[in-house]
Amino acid sequence: MEEPLAPPQSVLDAFNIHHSLEPLSGGRGLCFFAGDVILRPVDEATEAEWLGDLLLKLSNLSNPEYRVSRPLLLETASLSPPHRFIENDWTASFFLPGKDGPKNKWSQLFDASRAFHRDLKELVPEPPAFIGSRTHRWAQADRITWEEQRLEDTPDVNHSVLERISGYLARLGRFKKPLSKDTLACQLIHADLTGNVLFDVEDQDLSPAIIDLSLYWRPVEFAEAVVVADGIICFGEGPELIHLFGTDGIRLQILVRALYWRILTFAIQSDLPWLEAHLPRMDFDRAVRLVSECFASTC
């Protein structure tokens, strides 16, 4: 395995960082520690710059119900865009202590999510421009799930993987019913909370930390529905977690879409070595069956 490419000295100077670099586990193996700062490579500069501004605003709110990582401004940053948070395709933000793993902490995760999304709704009244232009597999699967893009028109579909998951998608598709846009208000959401909420492990009375924002413009319930989907697919959770989320007709429809989205992502721009290592651990069949039972009995 190749060593990750470290940020050059010019990046450390730009953020006024004077500590040695250490590779950080997680973050796709691409990030580095420097003292109490994490340096992260940028995938898309426009989105990363926008996100830096959002995280700065969220940090300034100091909401006691959750924490976010405060981004570092460039030493040469002006008070206006476009170059406040990125240097040579790297960003920097302060490290947040905590441990991931939502097992037995689902209620805490939901409470933090709801406080976080209330603030997002206030800070971001309109969808950012980059939301509709992204082409990575999660964005494409999202548009297919919400019937804004057709699967057959989607590039980079791995048809071998799609064949393996098509039965689950078909079963979920039978439960999908149209959702009126008048019923569901969309807003900015974090759609990958499950492994990206850090919890206090040393009795420091720390609120949950929300990291690695994965942003979409969807109903706020979708953020929690993805957590439920992950809980039953990856963590062996059962009907209790579905009950915690809610089992009214609208929430079940959103949960169906969350499961559909999560499963579909594996068939687009597929990373085959990763899939072969992880797909056997994903209990799609049980997840779809649990949701089917909810529709049969309204849980």
Give residue ranges: language-model regions.
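ATP-binding glycine-rich phosphate-binding loop
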Residues: 3-33
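Active-site acidic catalytic loop and adjacent metal/ATP-binding pocket
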Residues: 27-34, 38-39, 71, 169-220
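Active-site Asp-x-Gly
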Residues: 200-251
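A conserved alpha-helical element in kinase catalytic cores
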Residues: 5, 40-88, 100-118
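Short, conserved active-site entrance elements at the starts or edges of catalytic domains
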Residues: 3-7, 153-186
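A cross-family kinase active-site recognition segment
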Residues: 100-161
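Short pocket-lining segment of the protein kinase catalytic domain that shapes the ATP-binding cleft
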Residues: 91-99
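Helix-rich C-terminal or lid/interface subdomains of diverse kinases
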Residues: 151, 226-227, 240-299
